[in-house]
Amino acid sequence: MSANDPQRTLLLVDGSSYLYRAFHALPELKSPRGEPTGAIRGVLSMLRRLAADHKAQARACVFDAKGPTFRDAEYPDYKANRPSMPEPLAAQIEPLKEACAALGWPVLTIEGVEADDVIATLAHQARRSGWRTVISTGDKDLAQLVDEQVTLVNTMSNETLDPAGVRQKFGVAPERIVDYLALTGDAVDNVPGVDKVGPKTAAKWIQQYGSLDAVIAHAAEIDGAVGENLRRTLDWLPKGRRLLIVKRDVSLPVRFDELTSNPDENALRALYERFGFRTMLADLGGPAADAAPAAAEPASAAQAARRKYLTLADEQALQAWLARMEKADLVGFDTETTGLEPMTATLVGMSFAFGTEAAYLPLAHQYPAAPQQIGVKRALALLKPWLEDARRAKVGQNLKFDMHVLANHGIALGGVAHDTLLESFVYEAQERHDLDSLSQRHLGWKTISYDEVTGKGASRISFAAVEIGRATEYAAEDADCTFAVHEVLYPKIAAEARLKHVYGAIELPAMAVLLCMERNGVLLDTAKLEAQSHELGKEMLKKEQEAYQAAGQPFNLNSPKQIQEILFERQKLPVKKKTPKGQPSTDEDVLEELALDYPLPKLLLEYRGLAKLKSTYTDKLPKSVNPATGRVHTNYSQAGAVTGRLASNDPNLQNIPIRTPQGRRIREAFVAPKGSKIVSADYSQIELRIMAHLSGDPGLRHAFAHGHDVHRATAAEVFGVPLDKVSADERRIAKVINFGLIYGMSAYGLAQNLGIERATAQVYIDSYFSRYQGVKRYMDDTREKARSLGYVETVFGRRLQLPEINSANPARRQSAERQAINAPMQGTAADLIKLAMIAVHSWLDREALKTLLIMQVHDELVLEVPEDELEETKLQVRELMQNVAQLDVPLIVDVGVGDNWDQAH
């Protein structure tokens, strides 16, 4: 090992800091022997995650030694305010050190100094040898070490601090952190600062004067009470700063690049068995692997004794709880509301959790004898700084809803670090993602259901009418479970770099964009829709009369029974399919097949199409307009389709028709306000381009690289004709083949779609694969890989589970094989449009433009653009979307402009 290799990394963990935090933040677990193990489990989980995230060539876990340090000699009151260590915590120190060593982490404990000093010395050695150092800690003192070669990471808050991060968080450069802390004081270490000087004042002074020495020199110029307080502490400040400076020259028994060790699997197995860590034992493999479900350890502790939750009944209680939350690295957060409609719901209460504690803040409960509550206005005045602070990390379950609710009260939630719904969606997309299911699955914890608290059906009461004591049990448990589920789920995501990327770089930032889009809403011309509804009604009456004439009698066109009688008993049409009860089917597939040869089924289909347009769109959409905004505000679900595709609900804006003239007219009602235009930016043939990238097929890549019409190019290959001689019918067939094969279409399906013989369809498919052998090879390899792994992945690492891929049932297995081919393309397309949304939103935000993102529909982004921003937006949106990822074929975006959505698309 060359100590001068600039690519090498030293990974250091502040073991004492994490031990304390894990003890106070995680459930109180006990081993089968009755030993406390909660902190041990938390630290070991963190170490395993760090090892996976940072491929370090040397690493160590550093602990404080027993006894006084040189700082105690200089200042006897140093850390004198700390209570004695709880016995359950003290009992875990030596077993933890033993476990760290077994895990392959050298352990360092040096008498007379603190862990911070040892870490600083090792980082200094590594810096001098050109190594990079990553320090995992929650201690702000170590920010003084940060430079271009030293980075801090905080696994509990998911925060990374480089020099820019230190400046952003503290307002000063790393080399001024000790000056900053000398002014603010360090309450944890009992080092006093200047009375009434907080982080903002300290940062302002250092920015203004340059250093602590300069602040001292200009003390006489600073007026007010803080100036007086500063002048009273001038003699103390140099000493306070000395106490806060970490030593970088501690005498150590080992060099930094000698801190290497391999895990001792036998020792680990013995320790995991002793501690009862069944999940970690299972990760080692062997007989114990199936001993218990993944989250058995916290489950038993959580279920055995329902937590005692706190009700924040008055302002004093809230202030005390807020002071504690401000010191927490991560807080579970949830809201209770008047309803579930995001744009109109208002607060009834809020719940918070950290460690093993949780509390409920009732705000607007109304029932006979309900006690006085703080009230929404006063509570938000107190909580707003914490709620909006980006440095105060929060975790929630479906936080987008809570962010809407707070926005309804004028609060912009900051510090959104994690969302357990998204964690579950990324890690286990095929599972249920609601909190009750997550708690049961990962904690073994059966939660109180909403129905248990509010009742069901006609007897259901509003949450505001729920008695506060009962509301506390339910609401605080939600925040508590959210926090606990995150502690189990996130380490699993963080341990796999590709999943971590999908979660952190796609899903979390996409949530913020979707929130913005939902709140922007879409302007709807309701008068136009009402006129269309009237016209559709007239057309339906016309089709109804034509159907009566074709049937030879009046009948109810909405009655399957009467349609059966007319079609199959009176007109003797062939029965194509039967219902489960043995009756002739009149579903859409049957009518479409019959419509090829008979007039009445065709009329019935046309009538049904008109009826659906009227009932689903022209009649219903105007009722969805928010009276306060005059706009339609849909709700985008990120955790809907396992491929990552977004779903739109209440109303669904992603299935607005486009294939028929009447359907397209509905899009005319989606309009821009006066002075603005609708801009549509749509990825062209995105899934085929992804297939070209994934398969590496030279024919497909060549067609896309040279801007050819890919369907015409495919037709030329399949039918063996020159590109300029391809007929319209040949191109149509090639288009069906291109898209059909992506969806795993068989020869039978292709024959049905094209209305040709199955043998002819098979010839087309064989010809296609003989010309595009890369596609065939990719499909075969993907199926084989899916059978082996049980899943497939998108280009960006989204995992798509295929539980039926090895099923003994041929139909289920073949369906899974089709999914294995299609899912990576659909999933990659979903990832791309999310990345595009993020890029466009970031640009709009950065440039402070008035342009609004208003819709995402499959591969299309829709914007509302003021006319004076139109040209810039068209160019920039196309550029951003086309360059959001570098595939092996170019991404092409078609941009259209109009007064309404139909004109723009």
Please provide the spans of the model-predicted regions:
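Conserved beta-strand -> loop -> alpha-helix junction used to position metal-binding or nucleic-acid-contacting
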Residues: 11-17, 135-138, 142-143, 152-169, ...
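A short, charged helix-loop
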Residues: 159-188, 440-470, 479, 483, ...
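C-terminal structured "cap/appendage" subdomains that terminate the fold
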Residues: 232, 257-261, 840-894
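Conserved "right-hand" nucleotidyltransferase catalytic core of DNA-directed polymerases
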Residues: 233-369, 388, 397, 425, ...
